[in-house]
């Protein structure tokens, strides 16, 4: 497997080389009892998605310590706050979402934040 800077491990159970016709491929056992192949772009995509999950997961904990999370969706967090808290909450969320984790201090993160009365407005 691949150990990320956060300590999370990307596992490829029973990783092995197998012939597919006349070419050699890397294959692993998926959790659904299927066999899948591994190639560079798949490893890269999985690594990026896992790193993003770690970064946003840590940010969500920090945000939740101050404001209750209403909803998360992929790389977005949604809060329900009083109107008078909206600007302050948005600034706080943007700050926390851009904070680099201690295990990857050189990463540069960006964020877009919006205020609305409904999900449709945001």
Predicted feature residues:
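Conserved catalytic core of nucleotide polymerization and phosphodiester-bond processing enzymes
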Residues: 1-122
